[in-house]
Amino acid sequence: QRVQSDPLFASMSARQQVDVVQNLIMGTARPLTDAAQTSGALYSPRKQGAGLVDALAATTSSVYPTVVGAPEPSRPKADLGDGTTGWHFDVTLHNLGAAPATYELSSQALSEIVDGGFFTGSATDWRGKGVTVTYSGAAAGSGEGASVTVPASGEVTVGVDIAPGSEFASYVADNAPNGTFLDGFVRFDSKTDGEPDLAVPYLGFYGDWGKAPIFDALASTGGAHTFASGIVNGVTGDSLGYNPLIKVGERTGEPKADRYVISR
């Protein structure tokens, strides 16, 4: 209703008006802090998306974000892919209003906590403790607390660099050798009365996405992490590779791969 009636959007085509609704809803959503922790770490974007929708903010903001080069420009999020050397993405802030708007930049670089060999569902914020986040472009400053001002009826672009360091690399090697997600939010905290805060989620995978095996280790070789893969009798459910004359409850050791017998 706002987009259809507000003069700020009058010059947009019907398609652009549909897209800007999504931009405003996602861009003004509020990232939520993980209630199970006291560290202040946010829930991962993989768990909360762009955050909690703030209807008041979405219907009053004159500024909305887009991610440069995003497959869907109406969805302000940065999909970074996999790798270990870091990522760069650009966020453009579009100001439809008649007054400039100023924001202070902050961010979190989240990676899921591993405990006892298992992912816990909660994350650690590695920013400043193994992952460096810096800003460029229109940002006045490169670190946390940098500011950016969007001129009236104008737009500016801020560059964001996510750089994993050796401390984070060591943690991943020790706890998630097949790689792990590194994601989070870049937040634009409003310093202009009447303009809501903005946020853009990003998602990267530290490592090689294709490295992790689809199946756990074979029962015949040992070393399974959670549940060993094996071949079973389709009728009885018994594992192949054991002497069938020995009762299931009395079998010991691992199945012998050279004893698999399959026939039609």
Model-derived features: where do they sit?
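Outer-membrane beta-barrel and related beta-rich outer-membrane complex signature
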Residues: 37, 115-119, 212-216
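Beta-sheet-dominated interaction scaffolds and their linkers
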Residues: 55-101, 107-109, 172, 214-242, ...
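Surface-exposed binding patches on compact interaction domains or structured appendages
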Residues: 65-76, 98-172
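Terminal connector regions
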Residues: 165-212
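Aromatic/hydrophobic beta-strand junction motif of beta-rich domains
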Residues: 89-95, 160, 262-264
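Buried hydrophobic-core signal for structured, non-transmembrane domains
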Residues: 49, 87-95, 184-189
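Secreted, periplasmic, or luminal enzymes acting at the cell surface/secretory milieu
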Residues: 23-70
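Hydrolase catalytic cores
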Residues: 1-38
